[in-house]
Amino acid sequence: MRRWAAAAISVLTVLVSLGTAPAGAQIGGSSSNAPIDITADSAEVINSQCLAIWSGAAEALQGQTRLRANRIKVFSQRRGASCGPTQRLEAEGQVFYVTPTQTARGDNAVYDQGADTIVITGNVIIVQGRNVARGDRLTIRVSTRQATMESNARGRGAGNRVRGVFYPGSGGGMTLGQ
């Protein structure tokens, strides 16, 4: 029972830290006081590695925000013989981050607390209203809400370059964390 409690605390620490970070990193822009509901087909705790793995249609909900992936891994910092605060969260396979106003999808995502970043990779699509942006890699600096979309393709003739379609009257772009 203690192992499951430690795993739950570890995952909650990550999600709450996202919820109390600047708006761009909030798990849904919802209140950090909102309860967090995590479900998956299975959960595994590897105490020797300070690692909790939620596998099979993993989903974390807080308020109106949702993180879905095939697998979510939570890495905690080693503190002597026990595990301390969360340092990294990895979402793998069919990643969706959904808020009331935005949906981002990709193949993988990593939240790195030390680097202050969220990186979504692999066929990234972000939608806000009718506006859509696509690329290979989206990097968000959590504290500043600065974002960079990148592509592996280069040059005008190359396919799969970064692309955005923005509709008039919609603000001309996207606002992270809305």
Q: Across the structure, where does each feature detected by a protein language model lie?
A:
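Mature-chain termini and adjacent capping regions
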Residues: M1-Q178
